[in-house]
Amino acid sequence: MKRILNVTVLAAALLVLFSGCRKESTERLAVGVTAAELEAETYSEIWDVLWRGFDQNYVGWEIEDFDWDESKETYTPKFQELDERVEAINEAETPDSEALEEVETDAAALMHEIFDRFHDGHLFIQYRDYATSQMHAFMPADTRNADREDINDAPKMEKSYYCTPDGEFGGSGEFNYISVSKIMCDLILEKLPQMEADYTRLAGLDSLDVEQEAILEALEAKLPTFRKMKSYMEKNEFYASSLYSMYKDSIGETESALLRLEYDLPTTHFDDDEIASLVIGTTGDNIIYYRLNHFYMPEYRMLELSEYDKLSAADSTVYDTYYAALNQLHDKTYKMHSEGTLKGIILDVRGNGGGMAAHLKWVAGMFYKGERYNLGTMKMKDGLGRLDYSLPSKFYMDCYGTNEEDIDEPIVILTDANSVSCSEITTISVKQHPNGISMGMRTWGGGNKLVDDARYNSILGYAGCIGEYNKTAVYVYLPYILTSYYDLGIIEGVGVAPDIEVRYDNDLYEATGRDNQFERAISYIREGK
């Protein structure tokens, strides 16, 4: 359905505020694909839904170099052949499970052969296998980036930065930090014993009602994560309230010290082994450093437990503490800037997998004056035809709105192969800054915008996904907003190359605790080269 231009442009502006890069959306069905079709059973039916779903909803055809119609003709008979193999195996009195698994493997290979060609960096595909009924899921970008030599170079989240009285994070330097971790850790430690007791009690019952089954299912899913967190906290002597006393006693009073600059925020929003963190520090010669490993705070879903949600009441405290720290960072940065004491800024998004574009305001948005900054242009799906797009509109990043002038001190952003989505948008915003450069390694390659919220589906008619995650036989999380950035163009499947390439030296870190990429950023700001 066509819409007048002003509605499309308004929607585009709104999308920037509420778009993100989560692949766990389960909200909507795509236009043009019915709920019944999403319960496709055979490989041919699944392939048909996928083909039409992409044909009607994908926005990035101009960056692809293959014929989608030809793909339909080429792969349809191949999936039909797989269907026939499954049906022949199942006709036996005792179907051969190994033979079915072979078909499953062949089907997965075909899926990768088809979809690994797509360049979009967020694309996520899941389908229920016809032969085994197992769910298969993959991201083409994972396959593409797996061949990169530097894909596993990312600095460890638990890394400690070294400091000396005259060097990095040493001397009379001031440390600003937040202890959101204490809020989170205390909640987990307080609630975990009751969760364990509830799990033991429910698991021992002979029969359960619907509510009890839901609680038990939630506990079975989440307890392993919480146990890991508890173990992590017990081993981490620097978390929470110990941070302040440790820094206060160490800075300026020791000739050399290893200082852990981490503010750990355990969360089930990510994989079990991930820790969300915010780091804010200032060197002795007034270089501000900050690092975060996600952009999810605008809709932070803390320790979500489905119907067994006992911790969400602390959401507001986490919001307030986190934003207070970022606002404090902003205020301190501009105070030092106005006083002429700010030497430079290092923003570290290495290993940052992205999140919500609304979070950009509190990160890259602090470098610019005004309400917003124009990074490039974007267009979105606007009809079921393969090439039905809206007219291009400007893509803006929100800024603080209170800055009277741009930061004019050097800004360095550290990136690596695992800097994704919002991290890449942030990198571009720094590169476009007159005094900004990027350093490290080329980023992931996923700068398109995504939306999965029902509010915007009602406006646009598109939801950014096909099917429901872990429910329907087919689920695809795909962008329908194509973004082009000034000076760089479309970065899907390409990423953002650094202005100064520096490969991370893990051997150096393991031997000395030194971070060569961080040191190069410090050197650039101090020496201007």
Regions found by a protein language model. Give the residues of each.
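C-terminal motif of bacterial Sec signal peptides marking the signal peptidase cleavage site
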Residues: 17-20
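Bacterial N-terminal signal peptides that target proteins for export
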Residues: 1-8
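Flexible, low-complexity junctional segments that flank or bridge functional domains
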Residues: 22-353, 358, 369, 458-465, ...
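C-terminal "post-core" interaction segments
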Residues: 22-51, 202-206, 226, 282-290, ...
